[in-house]
Amino acid sequence: MTAAGWPGLLGRLRAYQESELLFAAVELDMFTHLGDAACTVEELAVLAGASTRGMRMLLDALSAMGLLVKQDDRYACRQEISALLTCHSPENKLNAVRLIRHGSEQWRKLAECVRQGSGIDTGRFVHDAELNRSFIGAMHEIGFANASAIAAHFDFSSRKRLLDVGGGPASYSIAILQRYPHMCATVADLPLTIEASQEYIARYGMQNRIDTVPVDLYRDAAFDIDTGYDVMLISNVLHMAGSEENGALIDKLAQLLDAGGMMIVHESFIDYAAPTVERAMFSLHMLVATDGGQCYSYGEVGEWLAAAGLRDICPVEGVFEQPSLLVAVKP
């Protein structure tokens, strides 16, 4: 290896240190302890129940990263960081941080997952109530901006009834119904997830317009869901499962759609010939996090839609930076 190549590789090998630093700071609730104040090492050590020695090193590292401002013997949190990592902030992304940390633990088994071709201990989100709630919270923190972008792009003025498949915190239903007050929606997801869905629906005052249906999309032979939907959104569901399971799912869902109804698939589509780093990494994350999931191409998902009898299948560009939307119509 050349001398020029080693420094770059070394930087990649050490990249985990910055993420572990952030995970530790969040676990110790450092940003909430700081709030809008400027505190000393000793004050923060008491608040976090930590040693002054360790706290000083942690705070200096956070300052070196540019997340804190150090002046004399006091540390303060930058305003933009405080908004994201303080528990009292309505904009906080703490559930997302915890989800990413959980993912980092799964990635430590990457070599084993590559050997066996699937993830290890992948069912925790389904059965662990605390982990599921954190996951759903993260989906809302990450997804609401995407939901708003979809609501702004599509014209739903002639649509009345939305089926939000695997809707989690109902972010997409909420964003669409906020923009189109004549519409109503149904969120279909796992029973444990639906408990969290109902909390988000109530938080946004949508109880009279959004209902919920508990369903296991990949295991239930038939869905206890009414027909009569003229728009259906399948957002960030298909990457969780294998090709055969997804084909069967699309076929069952298409039967719930009215003639002329629109099916929107929101996914992290991948170009196998030239995948971006982000999509290649996310597909690999699905290897460690699921039994058979991965990112799929436009062509693969398009084949499932066509096999289910849908037509006018086409990608939608310009909403997101990377390929993310595919639309089809039921004839």
Regions found by a protein language model. Give the residues of each.
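Alpha-helical subdomain
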Residues: M1-K70, F156, V165-P331
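Conserved Class I S-adenosyl-L-methionine-dependent methyltransferase catalytic core
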Residues: G8-E27, T32-A38, L47, R53-K160
